[in-house]
């Protein structure tokens, strides 16, 4: 269709006569995601996106952040807003306020009610959200005057000549990604008191007419808070802080501290297992590219230090024959399904081992799609313990016939705690996707394009089989490190650049490249061979 030169995507959509129940909120323009403010000056291919798309819900969420920050500064002009971690199907927000003596003022339910009312009013008034472009120097000076030093640090290292920012009724802010065009398009949100802060709840992507279901994640929140305490000590909350440390030659020190923290955490878990009499099996689960395998190997070393001999068991060897494997909605074999495993055999053999009996372990022949006997016999001695890694390891149905007191469960994931700036968080899934892109290319010959294409299917399986059971863990281990993105950047960028503009996956590759652009690189030569990152980068002293 022909449209006037310079018209916005919003105007283009109006001319199409199309309707979208939950949109449009953004669009793919030549396979790059743009906001509805974007102007068309020449021929383009356009695909409008609604709230049921990943890019659409991101734009909606960022706009909610903007409205929340504006409302908070209207009520408490000197406050400091920190958009923090994704938790409990929402986002944790910390609003720092101080009294005249400099003491922190705790957030109360009444404060949150006032903030909610202010946000609701701002949305109901349907204020336009203006998008502006300024030189980066001008943007830096603007945010410096506003006291937004995390944005100043971020933009100082952006390397960009111009910077886009947004204005809402005189309140200016920068966001990594597009926003909606008016506040009135925010049809639904929730705001609740949560651990001395605020939980901002957003619509469900599957059903945008409803808020995402609240899920208690007390153990997950505790892990995030533990890492935040270390970040405060290291003064390393944002990418701007990380870049400054790299620039001043502190990268090696940061690597050493981060690696030591991880090793200390693994050692503490091993010590706890050793002190729990009766534990005969350690189960380790986590989503894709969470570093489960290296976590398992490093834990085995620490168990050995405690006089325990770990015996590895692979859940892959307990697959059912191919003709008994469940199928998904498309009729394909669903190897991620819990019932693709021979659960009765697993429980029978584990209990036999715990009774001191000898068993012959199965081995799965992937070429034939058949379970076979391996000829390998196993009998547990008094100082031996089974270590089992797999996506279903925390699902209680997997070990339903094994007494709980004989099992210790560990959940491993890459929980990114560093922020781009105080109003722009880094999705934990981005960290894992970048790890997987590097690993798939290095060890499996799979392109970044193909990894990105498969990623939604991987995430779907995680949402069904892993995340619902993470709070069942006796211990949680965060495999992400503060410096990590600065190291994997060097290997990830050339792979992402090979995802060309003429394919659908370019939008995600471009988004990741844009985000990595803000981070200064660290040479991987400084990473020790026992590091969990070596599972993805290569050069590990562990055998995989």
Where are these regions (language model features)?
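Post-Walker A helix-loop "phosphate-sensing" segment adjacent to the P-loop in P-loop NTPases
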Residues: 301-311
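Hydrophobic anchor at the beta1->P-loop junction of P-loop NTPases
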Residues: 282-284
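Conserved lysine of the Walker
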Residues: 292
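Conserved nucleotide-sensing/catalytic segment adjacent to the nucleotide-binding pocket
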Residues: 311-313, 320, 324-367
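Auxiliary tRNA-acceptor-end handling modules of aminoacyl-tRNA synthetases
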Residues: 23, 38-41, 45-57, 80-87, ...
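Hydrophobic positions on the alpha1 helix immediately C-terminal to the Walker A/P-loop
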Residues: 295, 299
